[in-house]
Amino acid sequence: ETSPEYDGNLLSELNALYEGGDSFNNIKSQFLPKRPIEKSELVSSTHYDLRLESAFYTNYAAGIVDWFSAKVVEGNPRIIVGDNISDLSKAYWESLNHNADGCGNPLVTLCRWAAREIIINSRAYWCIKFNEENSIDGRLSLFDAITVDDWQKDVDNGVQWIRRHTVDTIRDEEKPWSAATKELHFWTFYDNEKIIIYTASRDVGKNWNKKDIAIKTFEQYHEFGNPVFDIRSDESMWVMDRIKEPAIKLFQREANLNFYLDNVTIQVPYLNLNDPESWKSLPMTPLGAIVLGLNEKFGYASPSSAGFEPSFKSIELCKRSFYESLQIMAKEAAALPQAGRLSGEAVESMQKPMEILLGSFAWPIQDALERSIASLKEYRTEPDADIRVVGFGKIEADETELEELIFGQGVVNGAETKEGGEGGEETTDD
């Protein structure tokens, strides 16, 4: 069982729209439904299969998400350490700036990942981990929304406990070059007292059955308190959920246009002969030649491009929906009281609606980070240490940058449509 608030299918779709590539192609049919005529028994399934195969996903969503994420951290979030602690302790706190997770990733990178996660999935979690037993030098880790599938909140709306579900694949030890044959599933519980891990395995592609039992493989008690801190993003600022429908509709429109461009806009050779019946006696050999008479001509004809104008305009309207959805979100963010949760410096510097929208992603990350640091200070018996998080108060952005990002000067926006006559466009050799 998962939390009633957890929607794994929705999160999978949102992540596929962001990631593109194989993640998108594996569920592409969910985004390109069959037309009523394609469901009929009178129409071959080949038509839909060809349309699906030719459908290409232009990943506008990833550009938006990555631009937002980069803007959130352009002030270079970092930890500032005062002088009221020992040199050894100061070295530890400052080390988090360039190696926040113990794997070499700096704090600004983790903050950018956190911004990306709440923009796509609306929630994320900081987790404090200790790489060595009895160590007090904790490191930060980021948990994404799709793996945290169950949780309970306390009376203060904080995290009481969470369950994280992750999967590893296992290859045959005797055939390490072969594809993975087993899935190893881990369910990790985090609460105020302990960390417990349950494990189970199954064949790749198989479902669980009643005989499958998860076995407790790890249990560790600790005195840190709950090491997980939720990044509390406002659900009304869930960007990827807001632009999901425009992204899907844009994909469908582009897929339909590409299919017909590939299959309809083919130049067809033709002969314009004086005697309509003379074509019956024309030689058909690879080395043959046709001598045209007076007023006869040979050429190529193709459909008029004017017929595709509605499709191009529809694509432009879908891209406009992207832009307008985000514009509305920016204006909503500027009107919400959450803008006051930013520091005085940030409120003063962020005046434009787009800047305030980006600030609405910055403050939850900073807030969760400060709660994490406060717990670490208590655990290290340094409650009065002057440790501050800075760098979230400088964001400069406006709608013009977003407009350029979405529309750019691509084929659809910059191409000029050349209309032909009733008979289409043609080139001839008289």
Please identify what each model-predicted range represents.
Residues 115-119, 175-178, 187-188, 258-261, ...:
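A general structural signal for short secondary-structure junctions and capping/turn motifs
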